[in-house]
């Protein structure tokens, strides 16, 4: 593949399996890769914190601490997904080789759209819940402004949506992981390798 300098190797003398922080036609750059795996860790921690709170009595310090981390890390996901979208808009999307069937590409687009809706919508719903309950919205020592005034009915509806989206999220993340493994081990294309930090 031609590089920016007109040669056939990676730009700037980088090894063949590295393309710097920006995406290339062959693979994702280090920034996209880092954001992807950091968001995976954050999502796992967000889910774990809200599930583990059930092991502690209401009002206890461990339960409240887990809820606090759930709020803050959930909002961190929102920040990172917006950054990831910005990176996506300024760089190419690496090609999948060999090219998958049209139906697989369509399913992949739908899956990614659903994941982005989830990663943006769920933190916003959580922010809305706290706002409508009249509670502070904590974010690593800061208090974010309320999205709306106190409204218990709205808080209840937002909470139901948030919980339903959380269940849907388990399925979406699981399907996303299963699809990556399918492409790697069955289709044997570079879908997963494009997002791995060390190898191509």
Task: Identify the role of each PLM range.
Residues 1-200:
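Membrane-embedded alpha-helical bundles that constitute the cytochrome b-like, heme-associated redox core
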């Amino acid at each position: 593949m031609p590089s920016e300098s007109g040669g056939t190797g990676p730009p700037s003398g980088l090894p063949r399996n590295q393309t710097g922080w920006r995406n290339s036609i062959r693979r994702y750059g280090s920034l996209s890769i880092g954001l992807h795996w950091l968001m995976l860790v954050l999502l796992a921690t967000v889910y774990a914190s809200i599930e583990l709170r059930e092991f502690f009595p209401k009002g206890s310090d461990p339960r409240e601490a887990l809820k606090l981390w759930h709020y803050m890390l959930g909002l961190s996901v929102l920040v990172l997904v917006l950054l990831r979208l910005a990176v996506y808009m300024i760089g190419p999307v690496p090609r999948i080789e060999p090219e998958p069937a049209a139906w697989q590409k369509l399913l992949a687009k739908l899956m990614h759209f659903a994941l982005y809706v989830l990663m943006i919508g769920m933190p916003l719903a959580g922010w809305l819940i706290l706002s409508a309950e009249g509670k502070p919205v904590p974010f690593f020592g800061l208090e974010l402004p309320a999205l709306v005034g106190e409204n218990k009915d709205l808080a209840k509806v937002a909470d139901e949506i948030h919980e339903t989206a959380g269940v849907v999220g388990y399925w979406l993340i699981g399907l996303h992981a299963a699809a990556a493994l399918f492409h790697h081990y069955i289709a044997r294309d570079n879908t997963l390798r494009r997002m791995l930090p060390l190898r191509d």
